[in-house]
Regions:
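C-terminal ends and interior cores of transmembrane alpha-helices
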Residues: 8-25
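Small/hydrophobic positions within alpha-helical transmembrane segments
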Residues: 9, 37, 67, 71-75, ...
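Cytoplasmic helix-loop-helix junction between adjacent transmembrane helices
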Residues: 34-70
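Helix-loop-helix hairpin linking two adjacent transmembrane segments in secondary transporters
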Residues: 59-60, 67-121
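Juxtamembrane intracellular "pre-TM" segments in multi-pass secondary transporters
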Residues: 118-143
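Extracytoplasmic gate region of multi-pass secondary transporters
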Residues: 136-172
Length: 172
């Protein structure tokens, strides 16, 4: 259910991105709400995909996990290329349509995940931590803060690299 919810949130955020900015007096509020929704979905996906992959029966888990983690980069390049081609063909004024087109991918994934049998990583007879136990763990809090800072750093570098490339290539 978590994987399906993550895909639904990702799709919902992208769909909201196409419509919500016009619904507010200040379009930034609509953008902020939309981005928050799809960021929650994307963040959940980033955290949940690895354990799902780990639970899949495979002869070579290391190879599969390595391939999985490389697809984040491939996906980023693919999104940039497809979006650039879309904008070249239809103009940047069609960005709302592009958001709706990108929303199709998580919708299809959500539907596909409803048919996937997922095994539990917790052994039979054992129980996982409750939410209260997890959030009161100092180790969890420390790792959560580290992941938050790492994500912020990653996004900062990503945005800087994009701005640098736009300025350097003269396409901004």
């Amino acid at each position: 259910i978590s994987m399906i919810s993550a895909h639904i949130l990702s799709a919902a955020g992208l769909i909201l991105l196409a419509f919500l900015p016009e619904a507010f007096a200040d379009p930034f509020v609509g953008l902020l709400v939309s981005v928050t929704v799809y960021a929650i979905g994307g963040g959940l996906l980033e955290v949940l995909v690895s354990p799902v992959m780990e639970s899949c029966p495979s002869d070579n888990k290391e190879k599969a996990m390595s391939l999985l983690h490389s697809f984040y980069c491939f996906g980023q390049v693919g999104v940039v290329l497809v979006s650039t081609l879309f904008f070249a063909a239809f103009g940047t004024g069609s960005w709302r349509i592009l958001a709706l087109i990108w929303a199709v991918l998580p919708i299809v994934n959500a539907v596909m995940f409803t048919k996937v049998p997922i095994g539990s990583l917790i052994a039979e007879g054992e129980r996982g931590m409750t939410a209260r136990e997890l959030f009161s763990s100092k180790t969890f809090v420390l790792l959560f803060i580290m992941m938050l800072c790492a994500g912020a750093s990653e996004q900062s570098v990503s945005q800087w690299a994009s701005a640098f490339a736009e300025k350097g290539l003269g396409i901004s």
